[in-house]
């Protein structure tokens, strides 16, 4: 696992264990997996929560049932216990109580705003970093498609856990990880000053 640098990204991804129409017949994960909903629709399985820094190194992870909320205090406190600095998240992590508890520990959570929320001023650096959240989405994609942590051929719960841990360990040993170049440059084009992140 990597170490916290003060810039952290968080996200969760779905891990289905079988097709929806087969969930009542699934005996391997009975009592473990649950039905949950993501942006892709309903599924039966688990949810993998990931934290990474701007260098693409995984900081922490947690596996929960699919019906557990991303903002669950127990899960979120365990995931973020060693963090400092800023935590960039999507709109699914908007919660006043979550913001307050993290702020008391010295972590500032930065999220986008929903359409039904009042506009608020955001630092230019934070706005640019929110657009760089694709780094954690890329990690999710690599874990699913390259390390193949998602498939429906598991024959036991221990096989599932070993496959998941092996995929995460394999990602930690990848030579090239996606990262963000944190150099800022002020460029002036036609009299307009602009801040650029490489």
Region locations from a protein language model:
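Short alpha-helical elements
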Residues: 1-198
């Amino acid at each position: 696992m990597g170490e916290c640098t003060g810039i952290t990204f968080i996200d969760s991804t779905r891990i289905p264990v079988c097709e929806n129409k087969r969930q009542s017949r699934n005996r391997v994960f009975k009592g473990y997996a649950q039905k949950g909903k993501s942006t892709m629709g309903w599924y039966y399985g688990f949810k993998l929560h990931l934290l990474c820094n701007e260098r693409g190194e995984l900081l922490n992870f947690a596996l929960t049932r699919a019906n557990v909320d991303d903002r669950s205090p127990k899960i979120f406190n365990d995931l973020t216990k060693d963090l400092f600095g800023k935590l960039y998240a999507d709109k699914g992590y908007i919660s006043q109580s979550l913001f307050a508890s993290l702020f008391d520990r010295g972590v500032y959570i930065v999220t986008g705003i929903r359409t039904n929320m009042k506009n608020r001023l955001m630092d230019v650096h934070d706005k640019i970093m929110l657009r760089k959240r694709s780094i954690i989405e890329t990690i999710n994609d690599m874990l699913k498609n390259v390390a193949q942590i998602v498939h429906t051929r598991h024959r036991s719960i221990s096989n599932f856990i070993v496959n998941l841990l092996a995929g995460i360990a394999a990602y930690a040993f990848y030579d090239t990880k996606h990262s963000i170049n944190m150099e800022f440059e002020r460029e002036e084009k036609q009299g307009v000053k602009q801040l650029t992140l490489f």
